[in-house]
Amino acid sequence: MSIKRDKKTVKVITILSGILFFGLVMGIVIFSLPDTKRGKTDKDESVAEAESTTAHIKEETAAPETQKDTEPLAEPPTEPPTEKETEPEPTEPETEEEAISIDLIAFGDNLLHKGIFDWNMMLNGDYRITSAYENIKDMVASADIAVVNQETVIGGIDLGLHDYPRFNAPYDTADVLHELGFDVVTTANNHIYDMGVQGIINQIDYFKNNYPDILLTGTYKTAEERAQIPIFEAKGIKVAFLNYTYGHNRFEKGDVIVNMLDTDQVTADIVRAKEAADFVCVCVHWGEENKKVENEQQQALAQLMSDYGADLIIGTHPHVVQNVTVLTGKDGNSTLCYYSLGNLVSLQHTTPTMLGGVAKVTFTKVGDAKAITAFDYDFVVTQWDAMHGGCRVIPWKDYTPELAAEHGMPSFDKTFSYDTLAAIVEKYRLK
C-alpha cells in the first residue's frame, strides 16, 4: 500500500525534524563544557580539587636531597669586573729614610808646659786650668763629638810636674777636659812614655775610673783592650777612632801597649773598623816638627789609609798647621785629610806655633748610605803675656790686633803680629 503525503504534511515534518536536530547539538555542546561553566559550585569538591593541584606542584618543584660526597655545584657566572674594579688598590707611598747628621770638631796638640800650671797655681791656688779654655767652651759644646790630642801624659801630681823634654800633667787636666765636653782623647804620641809605664797606667786608670764616657784611644793595658775597636756613638751614628804614633822619645818595657804607625796593623784595623762602625777616623801623630807642608811620607801613608777605606784622617805632631785635602781611594771612595792641626795650647816660642787648626766635619747617614757632607778649617790662637801668664785659647773670629799687641811672643819672635797670623790663616783656610 502506498502512502500519499501532501505538501502541508511534508512541511510540518520538516520543521519538527530541524527542531530535534538543534536540540541534540546543543545538548552535546553543553555537556562538553568545564564544570564551572556548567554551574558546578559544590564547595567541598572545589577544595579537594585545589588541594590535589597544590600537592602535584610541590612534588614537581621539591629540590632533590644532596649528599656530602656529591660534586659541588658550579658557581654561577659573575659579571665581568668594571674598569674601576680592575684598577689596583692604592698603596701607601714608601717612607723616605730620614737623614741623620752629626758634627765633629777636632783640635790639635794639648801641649801643656809646666809654666801654664805654675801660673794658674799663683793666680787661683790650684792646677785646674779651666780659664785657659774658657773662650772655646762654646766651640766644643756645639759639636756632637769633640776630639783633642793629649800631647802630655796625665800621670798625676805624685809623679811630679815636668816640663820639656819630659812632660807630665796633673789629674786636674782630665777634669777640665771632661768639664769642657771633650768626648775623644787621643794618647798615642811621642811624649807618651815621658813618665814611663806608670804614667801611662795612671792616665788610663784615671779616665776609666772617673770619666768612662770619654773614649781614650791609642794606649792600652791589655791585648784584649787593644783588640777592641774604639767607637764613639752619637745620634745612632758610630765613628771609630784609630790612633797611632810614628814613635816615642823614650821607651820602657812594661804591661802597656802603645799603637805604633805600623802599616800592616793600621790597614788591618781600618778593615775591622769599617765592619763595626759607620765611619772610620784615623788620628795619626806623624810628620816633621815646624814644617808647614806635609812631607812625602805623610802623603803616602794618607793614600794607603784612603785605599783601605778611612773616611777621615786627623794629623798632629808638627805643632803648626798644614794643608787639608780630599783623597780618592782605590775603590773610588773619598777620604778627608787634615795633615796637621798644629797646637791647641802651648808655650812654644815661634809665631806659627801660636796658631792652631780646628777640623769641623759633618757625618751624614741615610739608611745604608753614608758620607761626609760638609767640612771646614777653623783656627784658634794661644794668647799669653811676656811672663807666660794668662795663657788662654781664643777663637780666630774673636782675635784682634789689640790682643796681638799684648801677646808676649815678640820677646821671642819679632815677626809675631796680627797680620802675620792673618796671612797664615788666609793661606790654609778653605776657599
What are these regions (language model features)?
Residues S2-I3, K11-K40, E49-E51, A55-H56, ...:
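Acidic, metal/ion-coordinating pockets
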Residues K8:
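Polyanion-binding surface elements
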Residues E60:
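Glycine-rich, pocket-lining loop/helix-strand segments that form or immediately flank
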